[in-house]
Structure formats: structure tokens, C-alpha cells
Amino acid sequence: MFSGGGGPLSPGGKSAARAASGFFAPAGPRGAGRGPPPCLRQNFYNPYLAPVGTQQKPTGPTQRHTYYSECDEFRFIAPRVLDEDAPPEKRAGVHDGHLKRAPKVYCGGDERDVLRVGSGGFWPRRSRLWGGVDHAPAGFNPTVTVFHVYDILENVEHAYGMRAAQFHARFMDAITPTGTVITLLGLTPEGHRVAVHVYGTRQYFYMNKEEVDRHLQCRAPRDLCERMAAALRESPGASFRGISADHFEAEVVERTDVYYYETRPALFYRVYVRSGRVLSYLCDNFCPAIKKYEGGVDATTRFILDNPGFVTFGWYRLKPGRNNTLAQPRAPMAFGTSSDVEFNCTADNLAIEGGMSDLPAYKLMCFDIECKAGGEDELAFPVAGHPEDLVIQISCLLYDLSTTALEHVLLFSLGSCDLPESHLNELAARGLPTPVVLEFDSEFEMLLAFMTLVKQYGPEFVTGYNIINFDWPFLLAKLTDIYKVPLDGYGRMNGRGVFRVWDIGQSHFQKRSKIKVNGMVSIDMYGIITDKIKLSSYKLNAVAEAVLKDKKKDLSYRDIPAYYAAGPAQRGVIGEYCIQDSLLVGQLFFKFLPHLELSAVARLAGINITRTIYDGQQIRVFTCLLRLADQKGFILPDTQGRFRGAGGEAPKRPAAAREDEERPEEEGEDEDEREEGGGEREPDGARETAGRHVGYQGARVLDPTSGFHVNPVVVFDFASLYPSIIQAHNLCFSTLSLRADAVAHLEAGKDYLEIEVGGRRLFFVKAHVRESLLSILLRDWLAMRKQIRSRIPQSSPEEAVLLDKQQAAIKVVCNSVYGFTGVQHGLLPCLHVAATVTTIGREMLLATREYVHARWAAFEQLLADFPEAADMRAPGPYSMRIIYGDTDSIFVLCRGLTAAGLTAMGDKMASHISRALFLPPIKLECEKTFTKLLLIAKKKYIGVIYGGKMLIKGVDLVRKNNCAFINRTSRALVDLLFYDDTVSGAAAALAERPAEEWLARPLPEGLQAFGAVLVDAHRRITDPERDIQDFVLTAELSRHPRAYTNKRLAHLTVYYKLMARRAQVPSIKDRIPYVIVAQTREVEETVARLAALRELDAAAPGDEPAPPAALPSPAKRPRETPSPADPPGGASKPRKLLVSELAEDPAYAIAHGVALNTDYYFSHLLGAACVTFKALFGNNAKITESLLKRFIPEVWHPPDDVTARLRAAGFGAVGAGATAEETRRMLHRAFDTLA
């Protein structure tokens, strides 16, 4: 440890001293534009020259914060490569010791203490208080009347812990002995940060009075309070020893359980509780036999719902409350947050300010970190738990969210760093701020400076790329595990706050994390991009090219150690790379404006933005239903064990399941796992997935009439099918009955719907008997959405964007209602409602089919309904037939009618069907008309819409797993089929005959152009000069490799090869590129070694990859006795490797000249073509492949390595002749030569 006096230094101290002396050596020319003119650093720390005494802590009142405002000793970890004067053998690894001095930062030749607050700071600061000292300018006393809220916090305060003199009596009463306080965080129109502490909010739950009185012998509400207090005092531990009946308040109210029509109103105890912990304990443990209602509702939700009009994101106004009471400003020394102004008030002091819609000047921070392994292997992927694996740079861009202006560019660098002049000039040319480079001796000082910026500047919104799964977890693990820094004071709260990242859990599909920071909303653009657009790769560079038409200067992870060790100039290259990543993410943020849509959802659902981002769809519907239920006199039961399956047995709750999770739909998952032994698909019915148990049969479809249809096909869509079914048939928990006697007094058909679902009769009363709560919600939401959309055309561009995000948010919540009822372990499940919706949907498809076939079977019948059809007659016989029905779409094949006429008449046809068959608001709409349609299978088709646009759905040629070559070739084939009339005619003739007939006869001549594309593709695949990049396939790493059931996957093979070669391994959710190579001796040896590596990694704990020194040697096998079938010499024939074992990293294949497996790629091309075009041959894939192969000449193509050996021996390639006679002469000459 470094001594505070002049004593000798320990080995750790000498290491740090060498790091410091090397770091502070005179530097070369500095980059321009980074503050004061370059100069030698003065007064730097060097333990050999000047001992440093311990800093004296300021005296004064007890500190009310837990962030670092002073520090005089810290753990010093720095890479030895910063010792630039040391010999090379001394520059490996890291210095690790303890240092007694204040943390330092250097910028442009100046030196400052990281934690010192004063004029001339190196980064912007917005906080008024720091370390208990008020730094506001003289006379600072802003008046706050109106403020915007973006986040809401809740905590419990105790009266004995507060200074009574600083609080009005009404606030002290609200927290005596304890009480929940809601804190609204926001900004005033002038840009002052404000925190409003709202006292008096109480959580509560319900219990049936009759059951409570019978079980507990209660005669009055006070008796119940005494029983609860006694139960808490007897609970294990000392948490509730001081609880008395005064902690509770109980009253008797009349409410109705929301489940089932026959449930009658009853008396309930409503129990008010002063703390969420007490509420949770009571609902889980107090009299388990008595059902609890709404015990899981948090204090923030209660605050929003119990005060009509209050929102989680919007403008508020302070006003006089009851008895003309006013909000009380807090003295700065009593602040609990890093705001400029704080108030105490009660809910009656608040009102919504409805006349304002613009956002105030919130700040957005966009950041990115660069890391480097610091152990013996610097190419290993860094692990936050390893002290030697370091964060070396952090880029930090600060934006004004309202103007989108980039205000500051900061680069935190471990070691000196000179940004390239070209980069500085580029930023200046774009009108962007000059970066401020902040340099540090050690990792702790850099991380502390970054967190100090976060605290002092306090951005309301934070973004980055994959920051939830990597950047934040890495930083927080470093700070808490390595440096033992408490983080509870680094959000908006000064202490006892939340600054935490945790895993939601590793679901079947992906590993996801979530972050919660008081007063800071983290929006990861990686998640936004993967939700919004479909790409073959979600690397930032690929996304930037696709979305921004921009690209970054990429820097390989393998190059970072060398660049970092090369000195300030090369570290500047890393800094440029780090800054440009943040710049691209900032552009993506303002391209998609995710905060607008998320805030609109949060406002509608009554939850804060963080819950909107991380807590799934369930909570959004639940809070809205909770609000409406209260207005209608209903209460919602706590659901654990509440809803029983068909067998009458309550399903057990999975340990890892969360009520608010839903299984994400991940395109490409099936294809990534179906190769070589992928898992079987479960049948329809009950299906258990991570956090989601669907206990009913899903929507069905009308089987497609596969083939190539060259007559017009009209597609009708049901508008908002499932929401409209719920509305039309009044479906709800509260309108459902499972008993016939419950509706016996009502008239069937008129007063209730009777329907059989899954072999059971269900009854739903009509709206005039009892209106469905779900229907009311949907009706109000859709009316709101319609009103918002009507305002968009008359709005300014800025307001139009906001309104569009609001209407999109409403649509998202509406579409969540059906799924909300169908999750068995959800917040409020009702599988009968979900199953009824899908049953009615299928009946609607069948009814539509029967009506169309009967009503418009003859052209005269069509004319009777639509006289204008006379002008749209086309040559040929007339018919109208439904060829496919898919959940909410119906495909109608119309022969003898023009596509133009059907397009014009489609809406009238849809309205006619809607009026004849369906209850409003269910309605059909004409979505499109195909002029040609290749209908392959369910959810798989390709068609050309009237007007020329091609639509492709569910077909392999557009899947992101295929390589570029196969995608291009498949697309060329499809374009020929649809846009070449000769090919289209031949294909239509092909599809009209049974596929077996074509095995014995030539294919139509019109397919020659089609065959020419296949011949050319075959030539390109076998061309030795081909571009390997055209043959790169990709697959998503959806979870850690050890979590895969099927290990025989190509992208997993490449993952382990990269690990063995010390290359950067992909992160979860990355797409891994690979090529399939030819089987050679070298490949076989690598596969054998890789098997050992997989076993080693499987034994590694947690998610940490095993770090072997090299590819392990294959296990020795016992010598086998040659069999009679073995070749001479006794050597056994090598086994044929699986395709997944032949996968290789494209960069490695190019660098080492590894030959591709041409047979695989042509088979893959034929496979993709067969899946697409098998509809031409009766969906018989085997016959399709056989017929497509007719176009390819039978030529033997030796492997590339064999070809090379033959050429080296003087042999040349001879192709087939143009005619059979020419080929015969060539073969004759060859045999004569060999003879």
C-alpha cells in the first residue's frame, strides 16, 4: 500500500509509481481544440518525489448523501503499457495497489481533483448541491408553478428520522410512524430541475368481510387491524416487531369480484397500509385461506389511479389544496435529490396542466465504452469480474432532447490520448462540438469521474447500443465488485436510491437484462432497432448502413491492445472509434424518437417509462383495467393459484416465471435450430414457455389451395380483428358465466351469447345486461386514437410526430388486450375469453367462405349486388373461390374479372360481407389485389400486387439466414416467374397438371430462361474465383452456447472456434457469420480439438466462457482393429463430418485460403428453390428437386484441394461440349491420351 508519509513503498505501490511516472512522461504534440494550449503536466503525483497526506474530511452536519463527494484513498489499477519508458517485457499486465491521494483528472495540460466543484470544470454540471454544500448563485430562488414530470419514485419515510422543524405537521402526520412518499421528478419550462415529494399516498388491499369475520372473529374494522399487527409481530425476524394497529386503517366498502357474471356485490374490508413491505407480507402470509384483492398494486399506481387525471409523463401545476394549504419548499440542506428545487405537498396541491404539450429541455446522454483484457492474453474477451480487464475509454455525448442539438462531446481515457486531426476537422465541418478529452492515471479515477458526471449533470435520458446487456452491467460490476463503490446515490436520489442492473432471466429465446436508475431512463437503441426493423445483422455498422446510409470506421477488437499500447496518437484512433459509435447511436435515437412512443404508452397505461420498457405488455392493460374496474365498482383478485386449468387443478407457478413477461416472437429462431436434430415443435393446445403458459388452442386457418394463380386474387382483412371481436360480443371476465343456470332468467341470443369452446359451453351476457370492461377500454382507446389521427394533417411537423407516436402507442396497447387474457400465469388470466376470441375468429372465416361461395357463385348474382361489375369482365369463365384464410385475412380467387375492377370494387364487397355477417365494430376491408400469386403453404406466399409491387411473406429467399448469393439467385428466379410473361405462362401450365406427369415428359419450353439462371448459379458456385463474402450465412446467438439443447449448430461451431483463437466472441443476440468449408484433414483435426473445448466450456461456471490457452488436443483413441472393409494398410475411412462441423469464420477462411464446400451450397440453393417453387409441383419437394436438376449438366466437381493437386500435376479441366457429338470427340481424345 502506498504510504501517506515518507515510508517505503510496497510492491503494489512501486507498480503504481511506475505507472504514474510512465504516464506523466512528456508527451509529443497534442491534438488541437481540446481546451487550453498543450503544456507539460504540473504537480502530478509521483510517490517517489512527494508524499501525500490524507485529506481532511469536512466537518459539519451528518452527510445526507452516499455518492462520493470526497475520497483520499482508492484502489489503483492501471495497465503497464502506459509505462512508455519501460522495456517491453515490463509492459505486460496491470499495476494493482492502493493509493492515498485524491482522484485526479487531466485535460489539455491542466490537472484537477475529480471531486472538486468550482469554476472552470472539465465537464458540464447542473446539480445545485454537492457534498452537502449549496453551490447555487447568489439570489437563486426560482418560482415554480408549472413543471413537467418524466419519472416517479416511491420510498418510505419515518417520522423519527426526519427533522420536525423542517416539515409542516400534515407531512409529519403522513409518515407517523412510517409512510409512503411519492416523488415526482421533472423540469420547469425554464430548465430548473424539480422534485415534488407527495405525502399521504397509501396502498391498500381488499378482503371479503364475511370470510374475515368468520375466520378471525372480527366484530369491527379495528379488530382486523389488531389481528394483522399481531401476525406481523410474530413473523420471523425483527422487521415488524414495532408494528401496532395504528399502522393500519380498515373500512367497509361494497365491491364486486370482476370474475363471472353471476358474482354479486358484497362487503369487503379495504385495508390501508403505510408501507409496501408490510402490504406484501400480509398478502402473502396473513390468513392464506382468505382471498386478497389488489394486493400487488404499487404505491405509484395507486397515486396515479386514485387521483383522476394524473399522469406519469406530463405537465403538472402546483395549486392551493384543501383549506388553502400550500406546497412547502424544502431547504437545500433537506434535499433528498440532486434537483434545483424541492417541494413537499399532498395530492390536492397538484393539478394537470392540460394546455402544454411540448417537452422541456430534458438532456440525453449517449455513451459507449471500450474495454481491454489485461491478463496474459490481451485478446481474450474482457470480464468485468477480472480486476485486470479494464475499461479504457468512455465516449459521452450530451444532447438537448427538445432541440436535438449536440451540446457536449466528452472522451474519458485511461492514459493520454490525442484524437486524430482528421477526426477533429470532420466534427468541426459538421458543426459539432470539439471533443473534450479527459485523461486519467487509473481505471477507478476514470470510472469515478464518469459517475460524477452522471450525478452532477443528471441526464434524464440515457441511450447507447446494447448498453443494457453490456455497457451498464460491465461498469456497475466494476464499480461494485472491484472498487466497492455504493451506487444508491448516483441516480437522482442522493441516497437510498436505486442504480441497478439485473437479469430478467434466461428465457428460451434470449437472455435479457434490465436497468432501473432513479431519475434516469435508459433506452437501449439495440432493443429499439431489433423491434422496429428486420435486418440480417444488427451490428451497429450494418444498422447504420441500412437506416442512416452511413458507416463507421471499424476497428477490430483484436487491434485494440496494439493500438492502446502504441501511445497517445494510436489511443486517439480508439477514441475516434468510440466517439463515432456514440454519434451513430445519437442519430438513430433521433431517427426513431423512442422516448415519444414510450412516454405515450406510459401516459396511457398509468405506469412510468421504465416499466413500459422492461415490464412487458401485461402491466399496461392491467393498470388501465384497474382504473376502470374501480369506477365500475369491481375489484381484481390477486391471481396466484386463482385460475384453474381445464382439469380443475391449479397450475404450479414456474420459479423463473414473471407475471409481466410475455414470450417474444423471434424471427429466425426455428431456422437457427432446426439443422441436424433441432427440437420437435409442440402440438397446438397447452404450451409452456418461459414465463408464459398458453392453455388454449390458437387461431386456425383455412388450408391454402397451393399453386401458381395468374388470375386476380382479392385479399380481405379484418380491421383490428381480436379487439373488434371482444367489443362486438361483449367478452370479459365480468360478462362470462360457466353455468347455464346463471343466465336461465335471460333470453338466449337476445341477452347472452352461448358458444362451445373446447368442448365446454360458455355464456357471455350482452352489453345491455352488463357492459364488458374490456369492451369499454377498447372503445375509449380506439375513439382516442381516431381523434388523434384526425388532428395529424392539420398539425405542425413537430406536433405531427408526437401525435403519430401517441396513436401508435394506443394501437400497441389495444392489441395487447387479447394476449393479456390468454397468459395463464399472467396478472389477470381468463383463458375462456382468449379461447372464445379465437373460436369466433375461425367461425367468421368459415362463414365468409360459405357466404362468398353461395352468394356470388354465378356472375349474374355478382351483378345483382354490384352492377359496376359488368365493366370489369375479363376473358374466360367466371368463378369466385376462397383459396386461403389466415387468422384475419381471406384470399379470394376471382376468374373472369379484371384486377383493376376488383381493386376499385373491393371495399364495396368487403362492406357487403360485413353488413351481412358480422356485428359492429367487426368489419372487413379490402387490403390488396394480387395479379399473380404463388401460394405455397400457410403463411407462405409470393405475389405481385396490382400496380407492380411484389409482396413476399414467410419464404426462405427473404430469410436473413441465407447467404447473399442464394438470396440473389432466388430473387432472380422469382422475378422471372412474376415479371416474365413467357415464364409465368409456362409455370401456370406446369401447375395445372399433376407433378408426377412431368417426370416422364419434358418441361414447358417457356421455362428455358428459368433454367438458365440455375445453370449460371451452378457455374458461379464452382468458380474458383468466387467471392467468399457472397456465401456467408448468419445465425443468431439467441442465448449462451451452453443453454442450447441442440449443440450441433453451425454458428455454435464458429463461436467455439473464435473462443479458441482468442478472437472476440459474439454477444448474445448477435448474428454470427459463417461459411461451410470443404472437408479436409486440417478441418477434421480442428473438429476433434473443438470437441474437447466444448466439454471444457460446459464445465465453466455461469456465463463466463472457458479460456483455454489454445485449441485442446483431441483425446487419444484406442487403436482400432482394421475391418475387412478397410482400405489396404488398415487405415479406417474418415467419417463424413456434419454440416455444422464444417462451419468456419469467414475472415479466417479468407485469410487462410480454406476451400468452400461447393456441393453444400448448390444443395442449399436447390433446397431454397424447392421450398419456394414446390407449389408448382403439387408441393412435392422431392419431385421439385428432381425436375430442377434437369437444368444442370451432370458434371463431376472435385473438391478444391483435389483440383489444386491435379493442376499441380499438369492436369487441366475439360468441360462438356456444346453438342453431344463434340463431347464424344473430347472424351475419345482424352481416353486416347491416357492410353
Swiss-Prot record:
GO molecular function per UniProt: DNA binding; DNA-directed DNA polymerase activity; nucleotide binding; RNA-DNA hybrid ribonuclease activity
Region feature (Disordered) = 640-691, 1098-1134
User: Where on the tree of life does the source sit, at the highest rank?
Assistant: Viruses
Annotated GO CC locations: host cell nucleus
Q: Which PROSITE patterns match?
A: DNA_POLYMERASE_B
Does the keyword Transferase feature in the UniProt annotation?
Answer: yes
Compositional bias (Acidic residues) spans? 662-675
Similarity field: Belongs to the DNA polymerase type-B family.
Name of the protein: DNA polymerase catalytic subunit
User: Which organism was this protein described from?
Assistant: Human herpesvirus 1 (strain SC16) (HHV-1)
